[in-house]
Amino acid sequence: MANVQYYGTGRRKSSVARVRLVAGEGNILVNGRALENYFNYETLIRDVKQPLVLTGNENKYDVIVKVEGGGFTGQAGAIRHGISRALLKADLDLRPALKKEGFLTRDARMKERKKYGLKAARRAPQFSKR
């Protein structure tokens, strides 16, 4: 049982997280650093831990993550998605709880591209009547 590992890939915005769950005491490593050292915001740390807390597995697995691309918010969302998928592989009975909270759904929202003639995606240049 000690060598059993569960893998999950999570994506959010332009971030991709490859997550590995190993039986352990609840340590979370992100790109070789502790979760608290990687993310400076308590909200992001809470987001990452949500699937583990929801299923009651926060002290049952060690989580090893490699994440790349995007910013901190996208990376946190990708890690949460990856952890949820890995937990599902570990125990299929967790599916209803994870699905209800929306942790298994890939958030498809992406940054809208800038259009020519505009200053940003939708922001138009200032209009002058005269």
Curated annotation (Swiss-Prot):
GO terms for biological process: translation. Keywords: Ribonucleoprotein, Ribosomal protein. One of its GO terms (cellular component) is cytosolic small ribosomal subunit. The keyword Signal does not apply. One of its GO terms (molecular function) is structural constituent of ribosome. Belongs to the universal ribosomal protein uS9 family. HAMAP family: Ribosomal_uS9_B. This is Small ribosomal subunit protein uS9.
